[in-house]
């Protein structure tokens, strides 16, 4: 970790091209807001991280503080100091070096940032060789030093042929930035203070400016929802490739979605169209086709197909079949084969849950818990009206509605007694409808 470096993340923009009331940096990639992705990379190299906000400052700040409470938050004075350099004017600079990056670059890695921080120069900028440089500021390099960044509209024919372009991240020696920042003005068409002007000013003051060549994909900026989808696919591909190399078997991996916070242990199998959402931990388990797992722990179990495990469930040594939904359930050694809702429940080993079983956990005002002991047989089409406790070694007859606790060893049955009325079909429909 480099504690001599401060990192400033710029996240004050409106993000109008996202066409949403939601702040751009709170749009999620692989389950987490893009600002959180870049903060994770920043904190991998330093403890001194600041974020500059403006639009929806409180909302973004709240999300940041939930995960990184030590982050310093500053608000940009957009009325008086718009632009990328204007954002930095309100930040208390610290650290021997100041690294500036953007909150809408969620694919940037800590190794990329370290390369900028470790380069020996007064001003370090990031650049990449663009296959199609149209629209980018061209980086003019002479004798290994950056002389200028020339915008597309201002570039000569010779400069337009240059493929080295500005990637948008910078690292300054603090003393150099303190010299340069007051000299950046807003004498341009947009009347904004641009950090790109720092290169020209640094050269005028005889400071050393260099460029570090970076991976274009890692420095991709997100400006609209199409670019968001591209970035998410890049991140998904990387997550899945790493997991498969670590031993996770995936059927049709291109159809699978995995949250960036999910963890896998041992040998696991994910079939097609599976979604793993939130902070899941999955150990030695099979997740079958079209199942959704949310923020739960799955161990030594097979889930699905077409099952839904909702948040805060803990499932071990258990079979969950098709069209079974579990919410806040703790299941250990259980079989629930099909068509059941198991919410707010604890079910112990050896218990079989019949088709169509429902734990009725909500009375319209509050949620209640169902507890089922060991070696219980729950017949099909059973409703368990919580709060209710089922002891060990119990049989619950099919079609029962259980509203009271059941003691160990008992048969619980709650349904009308069957009565067969001979000849009723003919009496009801008539002789002509009786088929021989």
Swiss-Prot record:
Entry annotation: catalytic residues: 338
Listed pathway(s): Nucleotide-sugar biosynthesis; UDP-N-acetyl-alpha-D-glucosamine biosynthesis; N-acetyl-alpha-D-glucosamine 1-phosphate from alpha-D-glucosamine 6-phosphate (route II): step 2/2; Nucleotide-sugar biosynthesis; UDP-N-acetyl-alpha-D-glucosamine biosynthesis; UDP-N-acetyl-alpha-D-glucosamine from N-acetyl-alpha-D-glucosamine 1-phosphate: step 1/1; Bacterial outer membrane biogenesis; LPS lipid A biosynthesis
E.C. number: 2.7.7.23, 2.3.1.157
Annotated localization: Cytoplasm
Residues that hold Mg(2+) according to the record: 104, 223
Coiled-coil intervals, chain numbering: none
Uppermost EC category: transferase
Binding site for acetyl-CoA: 361-362, 380, 398, 415
Gene Ontology molecular function terms on file: glucosamine-1-phosphate N-acetyltransferase activity; magnesium ion binding; UDP-N-acetylglucosamine diphosphorylase activity
Region (N-acetyltransferase) location: 247-436
Positions of the UniProt region annotated as Pyrophosphorylase: 1-225
SUPFAM superfamilies for the chain: Nucleotide-diphospho-sugar transferases, Trimeric LpxA-like enzymes
Predominant place of localization: cytoplasm
Co-factor(s): Mg(2+)
Keyword terms of this UniProt record: Acyltransferase, Cell shape, Cell wall biogenesis/degradation, Cytoplasm, Magnesium, Metal-binding, Multifunctional enzyme, Nucleotidyltransferase, Peptidoglycan synthesis, Repeat, Transferase
Annotated binding of UDP-N-acetyl-alpha-D-glucosamine, by residue: 10-13, 24, 76, 83-84, 137, 151, 166, 223, 310, 327, 341, 352
InterPro entries per UniProt: Bifunctional_GlmU (IPR005882), GlmU-like (IPR050065), Hexapep (IPR001451), Hexapep_transf_CS (IPR018357), MobA-like_NTP_Trfase (IPR025877), Nucleotide-diphossugar_trans (IPR029044), Trimer_LpxA-like_sf (IPR011004)
Cellular component per GO, a single term: cytoplasm
Alphabetical list of NCBIfam families matching this protein: glmU, PRK14359.1
Subunit comment: Homotrimer.
Protein's name according to its UniProt entry: Bifunctional protein GlmU
Organism annotation: Campylobacter concisus (strain 13826)
